[in-house]
Amino acid sequence: VHECVVLWLTAPPDAPRSRKVTTHVELIEDFQAARPRLLSLAHRILGSLHDAEDAVQTTWIRARTADWAAVDNPEGWFTTVTARLCLDQLRARDRRGELPLLAESIPDAELAADEEFLRREDVSRALLVLLGRLTPAQRVAYVLHDLFAVPFDQIATVLDTAPANAKKLASRARLRLGAPGAEPRETAGHARIVDAFLAAARGGDIDRLVALMAPGVVRTVDPRLVREGAATEVLGARQVAEETRYFADRIHASVPMLVNGGPGAVIAPGGHPLACLRFAIADGRIARFEITRFRPDDSVRRFSDLP
């Protein structure tokens, strides 16, 4: 696994021990034991708690009518069915042009639930943003193998392909997620400047924000991202720092990233991209930054020098 990708992994809930199901009570017990892991798995694949809960619930409905006499590994059966349902959902989104799943297309209540789940489960916000760039098959193969240690022969069953092809899909996903690409030498310290800016903005530290920006800094913002009548361009370090208070709730859902090749951040409540910040940095200070709506064709990746 690529070094950058390893840093994103969080330990999923332990998989329950498998046993031959002989009674309905045993089926209920095994499913309840597996449910936290299934929900975590479905959330990583779909990026939506609402959709993940639907997938897990559908798995239970199918489990109630399955022929358990022919199943030797209930936990594996639950995983396979859940993953197939998730794959179907991703492919349906792809056909509708809904990949990646953007924040603006999600109801506020679902977005809040996604944000709470992301923080409770300690899911990497950057990873969810980047997973949205993968094809459905790549995302399923990567999540199952690299995050949940599902063997490739089982993944092949989910994807209806050969194990070798499943392995290639996971490998391609890994490359897309972790390949550092060409990074300008001068950006070596930019990641920490962006990280410090976001930390100060989250904490409301106006003096620290002023210190991180050039005196004549200019901040521009897409008018669709601010309330009606709000200034779309602000000039001066103190004025820009004061203005960040209006974006405090969004800054809490931000992660430093390279945006279209330059230093920036992605605001992604619940892991769903909403907006991009792009910074122009000169002499160790932020000289200009812009806030724009996230577009599906925006190029985003991790800073190589941030954990």
Please describe what each predicted stretch is.
Residues 69, 271-272, 293-296:
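A short acidic/small-residue loop/turn micro-motif
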Residues 262, 279-287:
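Short, solvent-exposed coil/turn segments at beta-strand boundaries
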Residues 263-270:
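Short beta-strand segments that buttress and anchor functional surface loops
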Residues 292-307:
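Low-complexity, intrinsically disordered terminal/linker segments enriched in charged
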Residues 16-54, 58-197, 205:
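Active-site-adjacent scaffolding segments
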Residues 215-254:
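A solvent-exposed, acidic/Ser-Thr-rich amphipathic alpha-helical stretch
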